[in-house]
UniProtKB/Swiss-Prot annotation:
Post-translational modification remark: Is synthesized initially as an inactive proenzyme. Formation of the active enzyme involves a self-maturation process in which the active site pyruvoyl group is generated from an internal serine residue via an autocatalytic post-translational modification. Two non-identical subunits are generated from the proenzyme in this reaction, and the pyruvate is formed at the N-terminus of the alpha chain, which is derived from the carboxyl end of the proenzyme.
Intracellular or extracellular location(s): Cell membrane
Cofactor remark: Binds 1 pyruvoyl group covalently per subunit.
Protein name: Phosphatidylserine decarboxylase proenzyme
Quaternary structure note: Heterodimer of a large membrane-associated beta subunit and a small pyruvoyl-containing alpha subunit.
Function: Catalyzes the formation of phosphatidylethanolamine (PtdEtn) from phosphatidylserine (PtdSer).
Organism from which the protein derives: Streptomyces avermitilis (strain ATCC 31267 / DSM 46492 / JCM 5070 / NBRC 14893 / NCIMB 12804 / NRRL 8165 / MA-4680)
Gene Ontology cellular component terms for the protein in this record: plasma membrane
EC number: 4.1.1.65
Record-stated family: Belongs to the phosphatidylserine decarboxylase family. PSD-A subfamily.
Membrane topology: Peripheral membrane protein
Length: 215
């Protein structure tokens, strides 16, 4: 059964929190240009791209309801598995690349308590570049049934703003919305030693739906 607190009627779509700085001006510009287009032929040349941009922004910042999959660890992000790497401390890092066409809202991979939310300044190189590990990022730590789980939201060349939704000390349920990366980028999750990965490089993931560990 899906998680009761995050499941909702299918087909319902909301807009992501933290999107208003981009949505409000583009939608307002589109609305104004459409009004002016009725009176001026020249204004139609502005109305078409302005309306297309507003429609694109509404699509980019969609935040659909999800029926949350039960499992020990679920994907925190929509995207494609970019890499799976063993870490020196025994953990396994699963990196998920988020394109501008993916849903940008990230979700809690497990239930637990947010023990740390740290913003680290950095660069803005493309997320598929190895140097993106030095990009601006937000490092999360969760106290869960599996122990400490680390998750990192990494900004990319386009995504230059990460918006955490919940502060340190918050108790979250698996699949809860916890943050937004504007226009996509990358999310890394570190699985504890002894937890086997059940996804592969190139596989598509859906936040709150795709399970990334194996029993």
């Amino acid at each position: 059964m899906p998680h009761s607190q995050t499941s909702a009627p299918r087909g319902r779509v909301r807009l992501a929190r933290g999107a208003s700085p981009w949505l409000l001006p583009t939608v307002a510009t589109a609305a104004l240009s459409l009004v002016r287009a009725r009176r001026s032929g020249a204004a139609k040349a502005v109305a078409v791209p302005a309306t297309a941009l507003a429609a694109g922004m509404l699509w980019f910042f969609r935040d659909p309801e999800r029926e949350i999959t039960q499992g020990r660890v679920i994907s925190p992000a929509d995207g494609v598995v970019q890499s799976i790497m063993p870490w020196k401390d025994g953990r396994t890092r699963v990196a998920i690349f988020m394109s501008p066409l993916n849903v940008h809202v990230n979700r809690a991979p497990l239930s637990g308590t947010v023990t740390s939310v740290e913003h680290i300044p950095g660069g803005f190189v493309p997320a598929f570049n190895k140097e993106s590990e030095n990009n601006e990022r937000v490092v999360w730590h969760f106290d869960t049934e599996l122990g400490d789980i680390e998750m990192i939201q990494i900004a990319g060349a386009v995504a230059r703003r990460i918006v955490p939704y919940v502060p340190q000390g918050t108790k979250v349920e698996q699949g809860d919305r916890i943050g937004l990366i504007r226009f996509g980028s990358r999310v890394d999750i570190y699985l504890p030693e002894g937890v086997d990965v059940d996804v592969e490089v190139g596989q598509k993931t859906v936040a709150g739906v795709t399970r990334i560990d194996r029993d």
